[in-house]
Design a protein with these regions (language model features):
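An anionic, glycine-rich sequence signature occurring as long contiguous blocks
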Residues: 156-185, 189-193, 246, 251-369
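Basic, amphipathic alpha-helical segments enriched in Lys/Arg and hydrophobic/aromatic residues
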Residues: 381-439
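Catalytic-loop motifs flanking and including active-site residues across diverse enzymes
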Residues: 147, 369, 373, 396-402
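Intrinsically disordered or highly flexible coil/loop and linker segments, enriched in small
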Residues: 36, 40-43, 60, 213, ...
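Short amphipathic alpha-helical "interface-anchor" segments enriched in bulky aromatics
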Residues: 118-120, 224, 272-278, 355-388
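Conserved, well-structured functional cores that handle cations and Mg-NTP chemistry
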Residues: 2-219, 223-250, 257, 264-281, ...
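Buried hydrophobic packing segments
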Residues: 151, 203-204, 377, 403-407
Length: 439
């Protein structure tokens, strides 16, 4: 088993020999939670072995080295595992719905934060599902890769991965030249082109419908925050978004007047309201930030980092968002400025008017756990080591990686509890997030 070292978290615990010896029994008990969701005995067995393989200390965690480590030189076992992952008809979504209940039991909090982000996976060739030469975040440049969209969870008690979607570039869905590849990869016929923000929405909506995980916030970067339709859908669920937005995002300082223009008596009557003639133009969020007085900015600690507190300057004010050129909802504009470089980050949030700045500062530091999940998954759990090419195989692999990651979160939770002197109550897990102010 690996010695799991989370990034930018509270100090981790070394696994003692007794702990290591007990992990296989603990893993078996953990897998038993999900076993009833696999209809066939072979699926139950191979799913347990796959999760076990992801936890092994191996240089690469694709199917063959994992099976050889667990089963020895058994080529039939390798083929059986490949079939289980690439073609097996088992329900990822049912497994993840059960997983959300487990996350709530261990980490759930009324102030929980859902986090949306993408993670890319460099790949060779053109046959893997959804692969395309596109911007690859892992490499920081355009490259041949697959793009995933992920939903995570963070609370004062820890963090976890929740769900995953594979992004299919539009040509993969609509271009006849890709028809053979779609069939070879097993892409379902009813899959339509979906943007990354709407893939994120599909995961949020599914989680909300399940009603199994306590949460209040949704945090995302500007790749998602620029999509006002996504933000309005989140608002419609009664959740509070905290979304980074591009610097050219526009807003009004005060709600401008609108009216239906008078009808001239000829042609069609004006169908909708418009800004009145003397209405001010909306400003960019950068223009709004530059006009703030110096005393509008306060220095705040975002979170405790591995090298000490992370500090930035913050300002906020109410603004009116733009929707199709007209005034939309009144929201918070939150501005975060790097103390050393002056780099500006801009956010919009539909949190209530009464929300204190300290809570918005807290949420601004809650996106990092999902990035940490990606680092941990790729470094320790083979998140990017898969060699399957199919639609089903990609989602199966990611689902089992999500389970493997949360198993380690649970182990650290138990070890942290047992390390407290005299059984004293303490933080519930070694992979902690800061506590929100006022809670």
């Amino acid at each position: 088993m690996i010695d799991f070292q989370p990034v930018e978290t509270a100090p981790t615990l070394e696994l003692a020999p007794d702990d290591i010896a007990a992990l296989l029994d603990e893993l078996e008990a953990y897998h038993a939670i999900y076993s009833p969701l696999f209809q066939r005995r072979e699926q139950r067995e191979w799913s347990a072995k796959y999760v076990h393989g992801l936890l092994l200390e191996l240089p690469r965690k694709s199917i063959e080295p994992m099976v050889l480590a667990l089963e020895g030189a058994n080529r039939n076992a390798v083929r059986a595992m490949q079939q289980f992952l690439s073609e097996g008809a088992w329900d990822d979504d049912a497994i993840l719905r059960r997983h959300w209940q487990e996350v709530d039991a261990d980490l759930g909090d009324a102030d929980g934060v859902l986090t949306l982000d993408g993670s890319d996976f460099p790949k060779q060739g053109t046959e893997s599902v959804g692969v395309k030469r596109q911007y690859c975040g892992e490499l920081g440049k355009r490259a041949n890769c697959q793009a995933g969209v992920f939903l995570g969870y963070a609370s004062p008690h820890g963090y976890a991965l929740l769900d995953r979607r594979l992004y299919l570039p539009e040509e993969w869905v609509t271009d006849d030249a890709y028809a053979e590849r779609r069939q070879a990869c097993g892409i379902p016929d009813d899959i339509a082109f979906t943007t990354k923000p709407m893939l994120g929405w599909a995961m949020i909506e599914a989680l909300h419908q399940a009603s199994s995980l306590r949460c209040r916030w949704v945090a995302c970067d500007e790749g998602f925050g620029r999509d006002s339709a996504l933000l309005d859908k989140i608002d419609g669920l009664g959740l509070w978004y905290f979304a980074e937005v591009p610097h050219d995002t526009r807003a009004w300082l005060e709600r401008p007047a609108i009216a239906i223009p008078p009808w001239s008596g000829r042609g069609r009557k004006p169908p909708r309201e418009q800004l009145v003639l003397d209405a001010p133009e909306p400003q960019t969020v950068v223009q709004i930030a530059s006009a703030l007085p110096s005393d509008a900015w306060t220095r705040q600690v975002i979170k405790e980092g591995s090298n000490g507190p992370i500090v930035a300057e913050f300002a906020q004010r109410r603004v009116v968002a733009v929707r199709e050129g007209l005034p939309g909802p009144e929201v918070w504009l939150v501005l975060r400025r790097n103390v050393e470089t002056g780099e500006l980050k801009t956010y919009l949030s539909n949190a209530p008017v009464r929300t204190h700045q300290s809570r918005l500062v807290w949420v601004s530091g809650m996106r990092w756990p999902l990035e940490t999940c990606f680092e941990e998954g790729k470094q320790y759990l083979g998140l990017g080591d898969y060699e399957v090419r199919s639609w089903r195989g990609w989602h199966h692999h990611m689902t089992l990686c999500i389970l493997a990651h949360f198993f380690l979160v649970r182990v650290q939770c138990r070890l942290k509890k047992s390390s407290e002197p005299d059984g004293a109550a303490g933080p519930r897990t070694a992979v902690q997030c800061p506590t929100p102010p006022g809670v």
